[in-house]
Structure formats: structure tokens, C-alpha cells
A protein has these predicted regions:
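Surface-exposed binding/hinge segments that line
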Residues: 137-221
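Aromatic- and charge-enriched surface segment that lines or borders ligand/interaction sites
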Residues: 85-141, 165, 171, 342-344, ...
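Gly/Pro-rich hinge or "lid" segments in bacterial periplasmic/extracellular proteins
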Residues: 178, 188-270, 277
Length: 356
């Protein structure tokens, strides 16, 4: 599907024009109240394991930012030198492609626990498993990694295309049908997650020479309770690796609070956050302009409606506010999960299509 490039009027209605979440230099005290037109859903699981609310995603990105590869300011996939010490790739005789990654030593989660290679791999093994599907997660890693389908179907005990080489080195092998791919660096945009936090003490990642697998009580019953807690937890015990820690979420007011993670090593440019606290709150279409002018919040994001853009420009003309305009490459799509759930049935998909 063709990507549409649209111009969006944005996010930067700041009372102080210099207040940027990723400014260089010494941390400056202060709080930004971020007004979001999309309410927080409260599902803070990695990526879109279950849901993918836009504001939830923004919070996830602020709390999990240690991707091996990331997109730069121009939208190009680049290697993240904060995380990756070395990356090598080779196209195999069967057409598959193997990426071998060595991460930097000394990286830690917000709780001080050291990040190692296994932290990047277990979630990929999880994405290849029937256990993920049993918990309702919408993950399809078995369609990307060599050996993933065999692991998913139970004909193999490990994912052969995911290898734990040593404490700081791992490799992933991508199926030949997925190669070549212009954006293949995205295949190694893996982020570290604490296995203990997400799946509990009863499991561990292992590689006995044939590929990675999750050992222990790796069943729906064995991990579901901890997964549920980890998804929705917002507190001091939440383990993450990003510029901010999610320390509170009020379901009644739909307000989340994030504070600086002092253990954060920096983004791909080495930048660290300068705003001490970010409060994310729900705004209303009918009242956002007045709320902004009276100081209820001081940052309003992603203004795309023509009338709202004109209102925003009027506020800026009055003084005390500024804006940032940015490009967005994106498209809208409605797709069906066809291998399980109600939409596995053709009649259901046809019925939904007839409603459009």
C-alpha cells in the first residue's frame, strides 16, 4: 500500500520554547503536562502484543528505548551505538540472512539490573510460541525467524534461528522469503525486556546448541498471572530501560506520570532527558484550547484537523506559545487476524467488509 506523506501541526505548544524532552546537557528541573487527544488505555506491554493505543505506545516508547536499531530524525533505520558494539550480517546459501549482534557491556534497567543478550531474545522466542497465542497476544514471530514455525507447531524444542552466543552476543536468522528487504535493519530492532518481570521466576531462556527456548513452567498457566500484572503495572517496581520510568497511572483521571530514569545511557545520539517529570493527561476536543491557555497543560500533540490548526495558530499569534511542524509517513489499514479468533472464519470477514 502506498505510503502517504502528510504534514502535521504538532506537539510543541510549550510555554517555554527551550523545554525539550531530549535536550543535551545537565538535567533541568521541571514538569511538562502533556495533553493527549487519545486517552490512555493502560496496556503498557511491549510493542503491540495485545493492543496498540497511540498514547500507550508513546508511553512505552518513553520507557523502553534500547533498540539495537532505531529510526533517526529523518525516519531512516540506523544502528544504535548506545546499545550495539558490533553488528555483522551474512546471507546464507539458502537465502536466509543472519544478523549477529554484540551489545555494549554495562547497560542496565532502571532498577540497576544488568542487561545481557538474553534480554533481547526471550521475547522473540515468546513471539514464536503457542503460549503467546494462548494468552491472547497477537504475535507472529514464527513467520519471521528460521525455525520459528517448527517451534510454534511443536515439532522442534527450540527456535533454531535465534541463538544466544554468549552473555553479550546473540544472532537472529531471518527466513529467506523475507529477504532481500530494503529495511532489513528493522529485523534487529530488538529491545531488552526483563524476563523475570514479564514472565516471572519460573522460566529462563536457554540455548543448548540448537537454538533458543524458554525452559521451566512455560505454559499459559505458568506465566499468565505475571504477564497480566506486568502489562498494567505502573509503579516503582516496573522494570524498564528508557529515558523515563512510568511511576503512576490513575485510571479514574486517565493520567500517567513519568520521571527521569537515572540509569538511562542515552538515545542513539547519546542524548538524555532534561525534563524531570512528564504528566500525560486526556484532553477534550471542545475544551483543549481554553485548557492550554489557562495552563491546565502546556504541551498539545498531533493537531491535524483544519479547524484545530487554525485555533492553534490563533493561540500562537497571541504570544507565549510556539509550534513544531513535522512530516509523517503513514497510512490507514484495517486487517484481519486470520489464524485464530472469530476472524478466522471467512463469513465473519465478509460480514465486517459489508459494514464498511
Amino acid at each position: 500500500m502506498k505510503k502517504l506523506l502528510s504534514m502535521l501541526l504538532a506537539a510543541a505548544m510549550l510555554v517555554s520554547a527551550g523545554a525539550m524532552a531530549f535536550a543535551e546537557g545537565t538535567s533541568e528541573k521541571g514538569t511538562i503536562v502533556y495533553g493527549s487527544s487519545t486517552e490512555i488505555g493502560g496496556d503498557f506491554a511491549p510493542s503491540s502484543w495485545w493492543t496498540n493505543n497511540a498514547t500507550d505506545k508513546m508511553i512505552r516508547d518513553l520507557t523502553n528505548d534500547y533498540g539495537v536499531t532505531v529510526t533517526n530524525q529523518g525516519g531512516e533505520f540506523v544502528v544504535n551505538p548506545t546499545i550495539a558494539n558490533n553488528i555483522e550480517s551474512v546471507v546464507n546459501p539458502d537465502g536466509s540472512k543472519t544478523f549477529t549482534v554484540t551489545i555494549n557491556e554495562g547497560l542496565t534497567y532502571n532498577n540497576g539490573e544488568e542487561i545481557k543478550a538474553a534480554d533481547f531474545l526471550w521475547a522473540e522466542v515468546f513471539s514464536c510460541s503457542k503460549v503467546a497465542m494462548d494468552t491472547g497476544a497477537k504475535l507472529t514471530g514464527h513467520l519471521t525467524y528460521v525455525g520459528g514455525k517448527d517451534y510454534y507447531e511443536g515439532t522442534a524444542t527450540a527456535v533454531s534461528g535465534l541463538r544466544l552466543i554468549d552473555d553479550y552476543t546473540f544472532s537472529v536468522t531471518i527466513l529467506a522469503e523475507k529477504i532481500p528487504y530494503y529495511y532489513d535493519l528493522n529485523y534487529i530492532g530488538l529491545k531488552p525486556f526483563s524476563l523475570k518481570y514479564w514472565l516471572g521466576d519460573g522460566v529462563e531462556l536457554k540455548d543448548d546448541g540448537e537454538g533458543c527456548y524458554i525452559a521451566g513452567d512455560f505454559t499459559k498457566e505458568g506465566v499468565e498471572k505475571q504477564l497480566e500484572y506486568a502489562r498494567f503495572n505502573a509503579g516503582e517496581d516496573r522494570v524498564s530501560a528508557g529515558p523515563y520510568n512510568l511511576v503512576a497511572f490513575d485510571k479514574g483521571s486517565l493520567q500517567a506520570t513519568l520521571t527521569i530514569n537515572p540509569n538511562y545511557a542515552g538515545n542513539f545520539e547519546g542524548q538524555k532527558p532534561s525534563i524531570e517529570k512528564i504528566v500525560v493527561t486526556k484532553t477534550e476536543d471542545a475544551t483543549w484550547a481554553d485548557a492550554l491557555k489557562t495552563g491546565a497543560f502546556n504541551f498539545y500533540d498531533t493537531v491535524t484537523d483544519g479547524n484545530q490548526i487554525n485555533t492553534a495558530l490563533d493561540i500562537i499569534a497571541e504570544g507565549g506559545f510556539d509550534y513544531v511542524q513535522f512530516d509523517r509517513a503513514g497510512y490507514g489499514m484495517l486487517n484481519f487476524q486470520c489464524d485464530f479468533g472469530p476472524t478466522q472464519f471467512e463469513a465473519v470477514r465478509h460480514a465486517v467488509a459489508l459494514l464498511l
